UniProtKB/Swiss-Prot annotation:
<dbReference type="InterPro" id="IPR009080">
    <property type="entry name" value="tRNAsynth_Ia_anticodon-bd"/>
</dbReference>
<dbReference type="InterPro" id="IPR035684">
    <property type="entry name" value="ArgRS_core"/>
</dbReference>
<dbReference type="InterPro" id="IPR008909">
    <property type="entry name" value="DALR_anticod-bd"/>
</dbReference>
<dbReference type="Pfam" id="PF00750">
    <property type="entry name" value="tRNA-synt_1d"/>
</dbReference>
<dbReference type="GO" id="GO:0006420">
    <property type="term" value="P:arginyl-tRNA aminoacylation"/>
</dbReference>
<keyword id="KW-0067">ATP-binding</keyword>
<keyword id="KW-0547">Nucleotide-binding</keyword>
<dbReference type="InterPro" id="IPR005148">
    <property type="entry name" value="Arg-tRNA-synth_N"/>
</dbReference>
<dbReference type="InterPro" id="IPR001412">
    <property type="entry name" value="aa-tRNA-synth_I_CS"/>
</dbReference>
<protein>
    <recommendedName>
        <fullName>Arginine--tRNA ligase</fullName>
        <ecNumber>6.1.1.19</ecNumber>
    </recommendedName>
</protein>
<dbReference type="GO" id="GO:0005737">
    <property type="term" value="C:cytoplasm"/>
</dbReference>
<dbReference type="GO" id="GO:0004814">
    <property type="term" value="F:arginine-tRNA ligase activity"/>
</dbReference>
<dbReference type="InterPro" id="IPR036695">
    <property type="entry name" value="Arg-tRNA-synth_N_sf"/>
</dbReference>
<keyword id="KW-0963">Cytoplasm</keyword>
<dbReference type="InterPro" id="IPR014729">
    <property type="entry name" value="Rossmann-like_a/b/a_fold"/>
</dbReference>
<dbReference type="GO" id="GO:0005524">
    <property type="term" value="F:ATP binding"/>
</dbReference>
<keyword id="KW-0436">Ligase</keyword>
Length: 562
């Protein structure tokens, strides 16, 4: 409906150009059509007249009046008013909302989706945990946000490629191998001989036992087998990484998260991508030698200081493979690249972008885009939950899913804006009450399914065609409020895609569920009059469809019974 009003306003502006009220060469304004905070101000409002007033050399209210008079007439608009300094408020006719409810039924799963992305490819990287231990709840938040961002982008017509970057090179992998070897030799974390910086969780003992048992790990088309040799560090390292990568993959699968691409940091070295990135930076003239190290003059590109690329001992800093990895994304044809990270990685953003700009290979400024998430605090019984026996020092994603369930875990981890800190209340997530938002939304969906079952049990045949034909009967306030809420869904999908904020979908679904429950409690649905009954069931089915569509974007199930 917003697009309908934009079209009417644009036609009105053209009419003002044609009659000389506006200069013929004036640029069309980037005006806003939005829903006012209160419905007393109409269903939609625009600032178009205020933006055009200067070009027209007119008072904004006077120009608003002229624009209102120039608007084409539409049966979907019942009233147009001028408010404040020159806002134009639109009141929609009930028929507009009734047609929108009918559109939901006809478009079904496609309702709310748009083609703004035009099928262009966007790479979405998320989780990207080191393969050194179980996924913690912070990784879980990254997984939920990243997966939902990709789903929302798909709904906005993008071709989202989901990517996991494994940091399988460096000191942390060596510490993993040393920790596993120590466990193989019977050394516990509190005993002499335990490696400095070793991983202390009980899961390391699991890795060690599997290695010595000759267990096999199937991972992306290849098999890694435990060599049973306690002194073969290369074999231990390879097995430990494969074992823990597989464990992480199992947790992500249980969480409903999958990836198109698993990219290994080690491949950047093996395939010459790190060397290529360094060569491009040197060729561009933005590097210099100092103190035996190779530096990037990243301050030329907005960084707060120059960055070391190659240390005096010949090894590269983490910055270099990060730049090489993002260069590979560009070379793979990603028109957009979005990286979901913990907020503690904020310091790396400017340097990676500076490195990409310094290559001078056509990568645009602001590429890649970043979504940063804050920490998660897990509460149970009013107290913070910190430890996991399996991980040793943190509460794992697997622990959380086992306690709260997949749906509640996904919902709660994306329910707030990514850059805000999140408190996950396990007790609330397990409640089957209206206080639990995921239960409240899912129950609205299940309630419609129950209505249809009740109708069938009573021998009342639901005729959808008859219901669509009689939606015009539903002009009471509660029905129109529900239709109004339903009609917001396409706008929410678009807004979530632009802002990369899937929590907007969760917030909307709570509001839609509230509108539905309010309508349900105040509206007898299974009435004797067939036309009324079919119309009400059709409206209920429209609400159910939008609830299902929105829950799908969040990766949360839409149950038929609860």
């Amino acid at each position: 409906m917003k697009n309908l009003l934009r079209a009417l306003i644009s036609q009105g502006i053209e009419a003002l150009r044609a009659n000389g009220t506006l200069p013929a060469d004036s640029l069309p304004p980037d005006f806003v059509v939005e829903r006012p905070k209160t419905r007393d101000h109409g269903d939609f409002a625009t600032n178009a007249a205020m933006l055009l007033a200067k070009a027209a050399r007119s008072n904004p209210r006077a120009l608003a009046q002229a624009l209102v008079e120039a608007l084409p007439r539409s049966e979907d608009v019942s009233k147009v008013e001028i408010a404040g300094p020159g806002f134009i408020n639109f009141h929609l006719a009930p028929a507009a909302y009734q047609r929108e409810a009918a559109s939901v039924i006809k478009e079904a799963h496609d309702y709310g989706r748009n083609l703004s992305g035009n099928g262009r490819t966007v790479g979405v990287e998320y989780v990207s945990a080191n393969p050194t231990g179980p996924l913690h709840v912070g990784h879980g938040r990254a997984a939920a946000i990243g997966d939902c961002v990709a789903r929302v982008l798909d709904a906005n017509g993008w071709n989202a490629k989901r990517e996991f970057y494994y940091n399988d090179a460096g000191v942390q992998i060596e510490n993993l191998a040393l920790s596993t070897q120590a466990r193989i030799k019977g050394i516990a974390p509190d005993q002499d001989g335990w490696p400095e910086g070793g991983y202390r969780g009980e899961y390391i003992a699991d890795v060690a036992r599997a290695y010595m048992a000759g267990a096999s790990v199937d991972l992306e088309g290849s098999t890694v087998v435990g060599a049973k040799d306690p002194d073969d560090m290369q074999a231990i390292r390879r097995f430990a990484v494969a074992y823990l990568r597989n464990e992480q993959n199992l947790d992500l699968a249980a969480f409903g998260v999958d990836f198109d691409i698993y990219f290994l940091e080690s491949s950047l070295y093996a395939d010459g991508k790190v060397a290529e990135a360094v060569a491009k930076l040197q060729a561009s003239g933005h590097t210099y030698e100092e103190g035996g190290a190779l530096w990037l003059r990243s301050t030329d590109f907005g960084d707060d200081k120059d960055r070391v690329m190659r240390k005096s001992d010949g090894t590269f800093t983490y910055f270099v493979p990060d730049v090489a990895y993002h260069l590979s994304k560009w070379q793979r044809g990603y028109e957009r690249a979005i990286t979901e990270l913990g907020a503690d990685h904020h310091g790396s953003l400017a340097r990676v972008r500076a490195g990409l700009q310094a290559m001078e290979v056509g990568i645009p400024q602001g590429w890649p885009e970043y979504v940063l998430h804050q920490m998660v605090t897990v509460m149970r019984g009013g107290e913070e939950v910190k430890l996991s026996k399996r991980a040793g020092s943190y509460f794992t994603l697997r622990d959380l899913i086992e306690e709260a369930g997949r749906d509640a875990t996904r919902w709660f981890l994306i329910a707030r804006k990514p850059d805000s800190q999140l408190t996950f209340d396990i007790d609330l997530a397990r409640q089957q009450s209206n206080d639990n938002p995921v239960f409240y939304v899912q129950y609205a969906h299940a309630r419609v399914c129950s209505l249809l079952r009740q109708a069938q049990e009573k021998g009342l045949v639901y005729e959808q065609g008859n219901g669509l034909a009689n939606l015009g009967r539903l002009a009471d306030d509660a029905s129109l409020l529900l239709m109004n809420e339903i009609s917001r869904y396409p706008e929410v999908v678009e807004a979530a895609g632009v802002a990369l904020e899937p929590h907007l979908v969760a917030q909307y679904l709570r509001e839609l569920a509230h509108a539905f429950h309010t309508w349900y409690h105040g509206t007898p649905v299974l009435v004797e009059d067939a036309a009324d009954r079919n119309a009400k069931l059709t409206l209920a089915c429209a609400a159910r469809q939008v609830l299902a569509n929105g829950l799908e974007l969040l990766g949360v199930s839409a149950p038929e019974k609860m």
